[in-house]
Amino acid sequence: MKVFCVHPSPLMYTKVFLRLEPLGLELVAESLRRAGHDIRLMDLQVESHADFLRELDTWRPDVVCFSLNYLANVPEVIDLAKTAKSRLPECFTFVGGHSASFVAKDLLDHGEGLLDCVLRGEGEAGAPKLLETLARRGNIDEVPGVVSLTGEGPPPGFTDNLDEHLPARDLLKYRRKYFLGTLDPCASIEFSRGCPWDCSFCSAWTFYGRSYRVMSTERIMEDLRRIKEPGIFIVDDVAFIQAQHGMEIGEAIAREGIRKQYYLETRGDVLLRNKEVFKLWKKLGMEYMFLGVEAIDAEGLQKFRKRVSLGKNFEALEFARSLGITVAINLIADPDWDRERFEVIRQWCMEIPEIVNISVNTPYPGTESWHTESRQLTTRDYRLFDIQHAVLPTRLPLPEFYGELVKTQQVLYKKHMGWAAARDTLKILGGHLLRGQTNFLRSLWKFNSVFNPELQLADHRQPVKYPMTLPPAPTEQKIEAKTLYVHRSQGRKSRALDDATEKFVDEGRMGAATG
């Protein structure tokens, strides 16, 4: 069958600071290609809706599938699915991805019969089975992970072997368009999948049932050899939890003499526990690291169930500085913040050398906070669930909250991304221009056109086309973790951690999930 795989448009934050290749969709595309299907992939981060329509009309695919990893893309994906079905009534339309797995019934209801099904869970496992069932005219409601208007299949299963597929990077037309800050161009790669912790604001662990699986060093090296871009983003939710795995990969890279610049995300306690791993990766080219600090006081850490003490976080920052790594940290702005709190945050951020990103506390389907805070929501508009809009009641009037938020973001942007900072990176910019790369350069003047309080307020005034359904009111204050899982928990056996690391993880959890 002819299968058209589509990734939706960029969100607010990604219009400025980064544009990452759709790695998950590339893996699904490869699994379908290996099953014998004719695949085309379009990324609307770098192509247009007009391109999408042209491909529909000229190629006339049998199947159109959409990747939906972010809630704010829900309205766009529903509209695109409806458009595909209206132009090609015989085509089969379905949606998969992280966020789609948590809001499947909403997608089908809003699809009004023009969306054939939602595929929950890992796409490499489910998509080939779904298309095989379609080809033999079987009952799709028997496929694991399928949710349709007529029924629901068994729970989704994991991909049997994470080493089986390499991303179908060759299907993307504009690879030079992907970047991450000064890493321009930048590819993405996966070393592990899942997260064994249980932070209340995050759905990474609930999607995977608190599992943690790793790719083999051989598979990772094969993928690395194929990557031509000088920059690489390691997409793992928490990099190098298992020290031995990180060392094995690093030593293999050193033996082959592969030189890249790497950006990864990890936790402060993991960084401190596995110092030798990160020292090795610094030698290999790890220039940038993202740490999810989330809060600068104990109360905030407790709220988000980040069981890493302030002392440990600051110690981790000191260690990263000692290695010469550029560190970016994230703080979560709570809607309860007042002017004084914003000013404290600004002052603190200016006193440290790290890059600081501010996101807005947002309860998402699939998180525990969704079940405890969703009743307070001030909007049910999917578009606003992008961690840059306030969807909970704010202490300040909303215009003032956005004014303080953007003021804080502007201060931090000018600190590290403005023209004054660009003077310190002229060598980097020169190298980019010599290679014909302008993504980072263009990002330097995009900020004010995107991060604008008036634009954020205007977003709230737009009509809600597809309202979000709230969860049932919880009958107990404590949420059972198993009720949140997309993939069923398989307990200890699903985590590729030695006993000492499993104990370390448990000591860093707040006890919500038992599997």
Swiss-Prot record:
EC id: 2.1.1.-
Molecular function as annotated in GO: cobalamin binding; iron-sulfur cluster binding; metal ion binding; methyltransferase activity
UniProt GO BP: methylation
Record-linked InterPro entries: Aldolase_TIM, Cobalamin-bd, Cobalamin-bd_sf, Elp3/MiaA/NifB-like_rSAM, HpnR_B12_rSAM, rSAM, Tetrapyrrole_Bchl_Biosynth_MTs
Cofactor note (record): Binds 1 [4Fe-4S] cluster. The cluster is coordinated with 3 cysteines and an exchangeable S-adenosyl-L-methionine.
EC class (word): transferase
Occurrences of domain B12-binding (ranges): 8-141
Entry keyword Metal-binding: yes
Residue ranges of every copy of the Radical SAM core domain listed in the record: 181-395
NCBIfam families per UniProt: HpnR_B12_rSAM (TIGR04367)
Name listed for the protein in its UniProt record: Hopanoid C-3 methylase
Organism: Methylococcus capsulatus (strain ATCC 33009 / NCIMB 11132 / Bath)
Gene name of the record: hpnR
